[in-house]
């Protein structure tokens, strides 16, 4: 064994010496006086990058080639090799060889004192050499071969491996890897230095800003909120001293003091409760002549809600002033006035059966004259008792059977005067149960002076039914308590349309995009709540995740200063989510479920499954151009767009448009349409005024709105409206009916489009 290893080492030494003393290659050589310009480092790296695919082929290109080793001066060697074919070696192994089944290596030498040797690995001459030796080794036990024979076979195997060449190749590869590591280390050092500089700049900027954190800005913005709310006399919802129980007691005390100026008959004094906090709101009263007595039976107050609580569905118990005095505040000048309607600037026309005053049971007065309505003041139909009736109060109300005359109230100077005789309100209109219905929304800003609002305290009365007025809607009185979940009646849907606006008719043009910000990854979505009074912006970065980020306004969004974040209990998929009426609607990742997440209470408010959705079980982890389940909002409310199988046709996948109940996420067959749009054949889609629009491409700069489906007429057209994807990678398009804008996420850029209607 030692002898064999010694032979291998000697042969390697001879081969190395032979290569070292080999004659230089013939041909032209470069003159020594010509200076070559060394390539720069950038050129070397560029050449390495260009030739990176040929590195291994260059290193291993002559691995199986025959090499000539020469020794001596002026020596020329030539090797002529005739290898054995694969079929020939198989015939040799099978014992059916032919005369031509052999290989030769011929050496041709020229020149004095020249020694040449042709070196060829067995793999280049006999392709079956390795298989032959392996077969012999396997048969060694049965043939009882000697150890020397096995050593010879191993030597041949090592020789066939060409270890010297492998060592050379390995050395070159190691050298290249070392060079790569050195370059990477330099680049990492530069990047680390740049990162340190950036971190220092960020720290310096943060130190300069100081207390400009979003959490501290909440306290700084309270004076702005107060100044904005001073335009509305009843909107004092941001201060704890204006809680409803204190407001009622203090206001009642003020009004009772003002009534002392009037000559009234002795009344049972009400239960006096000392105000726990000083009253900051002044109730403006106008003095009345002492010779005209006034009867006060009940007082109704309105309390606006916090913008964060405007969509909260909580039923507060009514805290009326006790009605045992038999008084009713009918003086127009002493009512709390509002500066704007509750819903929108456009006021709905009043119905013929409505009037400014509530219709009472007695249709005629004591003098036989029909009852007329007051233009500005409202007469409550009854003194609504608390939800838990007090026995003493009930007894006093039942004993009170004599109708009390009331004084007529002069109308507002801005309105037409209507002669109003004294009216009688029978005591039978008193109800012992009352329900409180929350106002539709908080007043956004100033409004006409003649408009005022009452909290809708409805009281069930025998026929004729009592109607209570709330700005922008008519609602009949109902008995019992309101269910905890909100129900969208047609009147309330009209209120929503009044808040976010009504349809402007046919879509005519979509203007070019306006880039608002650059934020986040290539895929994502940003949106605003069309029913909110503030300008908050919500962002979902990427098409998969579970964190919703909130910004107070667009300016904070541009600065990257988020004000809140919501960790969702279930992840979303896609970019088709929306924020509507204080809730986040999205499709749970890798499921058929849609979820409504209440942003104020931070819990899942509703959950539903789309049974007919054409869901791909093996959804690939890549963006496919649009979301499978897409929510949309327009002037009519909440919509849902998703693919489903067309049962009536040839079981093709079609896009379904369905009106979604925002409360329980339910859909109705009457408001569900199967469109002619096909899956994966469009870019993004959105809904405007009950019409579904689809863009033909999401990654072409100049695209078109190539499809429109009208839910009013059940017709579909090809509008061919131009739509520009400025950054050629739009992953979200959503319509906001409040702003009349399209919000889009285009390759990490947040852009908006103005919507222009034909009329």
From Swiss-Prot:
O-glycosylated and N-glycosylated. Homodimer. Binds to heparin and chondroitin sulfate E. SMART domains: OLF (SM00284). It comes from the Eukaryota. This is Olfactomedin-like protein 2B. Glycans are attached at residues 187, 213, 704. Its main location: secreted.
């Amino acid at each position: 064994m030692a002898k064999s290893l010694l032979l291998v080492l000697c042969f390697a030494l001879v081969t190395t010496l032979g290569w070292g003393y080999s004659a230089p290659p013939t041909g032209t050589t470069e003159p020594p006086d010509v200076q070559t310009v060394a390539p720069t480092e950038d050129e070397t790296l560029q050449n390495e990058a260009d030739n990176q695919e040929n590195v291994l082929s260059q290193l291993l290109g002559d691995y199986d080639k025959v090499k000539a080793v020469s020794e001596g001066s002026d020596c020329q060697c030539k090797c002529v090799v005739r290898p054995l074919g694969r079929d020939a070696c198989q015939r040799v192994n099978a014992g059916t060889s032919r005369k031509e089944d052999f290989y030769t290596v011929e050496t041709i030498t020229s020149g004095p004192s020249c020694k040449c040797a042709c070196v060829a690995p067995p793999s280049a001459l006999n392709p079956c050499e390795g298989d032959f030796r392996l077969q012999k080794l396997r048969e060694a036990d049965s043939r009882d071969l000697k150890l020397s024979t096995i050593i010879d076979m191993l030597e041949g195997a090592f020789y066939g491996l060409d270890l010297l060449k492998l060592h050379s190749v390995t050395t070159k590869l190691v050298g290249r890897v070392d060079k790569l590591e050195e370059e990477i280390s330099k680049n990492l050092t530069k990047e680390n230095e740049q990162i340190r500089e950036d971190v220092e700049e960020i720290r310096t900027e943060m130190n300069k800003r100081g207390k400009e954190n979003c959490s501290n800005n909440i306290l700084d913005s309270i004076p702005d909120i107060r100044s904005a709310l001073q335009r509305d006399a009843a909107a004092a919802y941001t201060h704890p001293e204006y809680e409803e129980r204190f407001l009622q007691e203090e206001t009642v005390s003020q009004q009772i003091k003002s009534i002392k100026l009037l000559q009234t008959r002795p009344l049972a004094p009400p239960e006096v409760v000392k105000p726990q906090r000083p009253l900051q709101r002044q109730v403006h009263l106008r003095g009345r002549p002492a010779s005209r007595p006034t009867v006060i039976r009940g007082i109704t107050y309105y309390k606006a809600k916090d913008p964060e609580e405007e969509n909260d569905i909580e039923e507060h118990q009514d805290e009326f002033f006790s009605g045992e005095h038999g008084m009713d505040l009918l003086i127009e000048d002493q009512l709390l006035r509002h500066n704007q309607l509750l819903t929108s600037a456009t006021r709905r026309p009043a119905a013929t059966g409505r009037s400014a005053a509530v219709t009472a049971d007695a249709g005629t007065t004591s003098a036989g004259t029909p009852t007329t309505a007051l233009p500005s003041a409202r007469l409550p139909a009854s003194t609504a008792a608390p939800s838990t009736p007090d026995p003493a109060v009930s007894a006093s109300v039942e004993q009170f059977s004599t109708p009390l005359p009331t004084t007529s109230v002069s109308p507002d100077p801005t309105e037409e005067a209507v002669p109003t005789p004294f009216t009688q309100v029978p005591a039978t209109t008193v109800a012992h149960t009352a329900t409180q219905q929350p106002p539709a929304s908080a007043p956004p800003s100033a409004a006409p002076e003649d408009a005022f609002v009452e909290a809708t305290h409805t009281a069930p009365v025998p026929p004729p039914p009592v109607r209570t007025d709330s700005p922008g809607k008519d609602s009949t009185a109902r008995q019992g308590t309101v269910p905890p979940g909100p129900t969208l009646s047609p009147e309330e849907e009209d209120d929503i349309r009044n808040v976010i606006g009504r349809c402007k008719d046919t879509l005519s043009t979509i203007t070019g995009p306006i880039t608002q910000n650059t934020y986040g990854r290539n895929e994502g979505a940003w949106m605003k709540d069309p029913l909110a009074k503030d300008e908050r912006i919500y962002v979902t970065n990427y098409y998969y995740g579970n964190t919703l980020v909130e910004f107070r306004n667009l300016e904070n969004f541009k600065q990257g200063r988020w004000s809140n974040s919501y960790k969702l209990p279930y992840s979303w998929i896609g970019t088709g989510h929306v924020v509507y009426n204080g809730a986040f609607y999205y499709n749970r990742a890798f499921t058929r479920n849609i979820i409504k997440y209440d942003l104020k209470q931070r819990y899942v408010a509703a959950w539903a499954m789309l049974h007919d959705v054409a869901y791909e079980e093996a959804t690939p982890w890549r963006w496919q151009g649009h979301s499978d389940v897409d929510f949309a909002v327009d002037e009519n409310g909440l919509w849902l767009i998703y693919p489903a199988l067309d049962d009536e046709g040839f079981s093709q996948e079609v896009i379904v448009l369905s009106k979604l109940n925002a409360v329980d996420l339910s859909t109705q067959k009457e408001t569900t349409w199967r469109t002619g749009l096909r899956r994966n054949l469009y870019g993004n889609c959105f809904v405007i005024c009950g019409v579904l629009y689809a863009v033909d491409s999401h990654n072409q700069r100049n695209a078109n709105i190539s499809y429109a489906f009208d839910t009013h007429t059940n017709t579909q057209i090809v509008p061919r409206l131009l739509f520009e994807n400025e950054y050629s990678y739009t992953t979200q398009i959503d319509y906001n009916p409040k702003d009349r804008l399209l919000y889009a996420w285009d390759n990490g850029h947040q852009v908006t489009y103005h919507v222009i209607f034909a009329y």
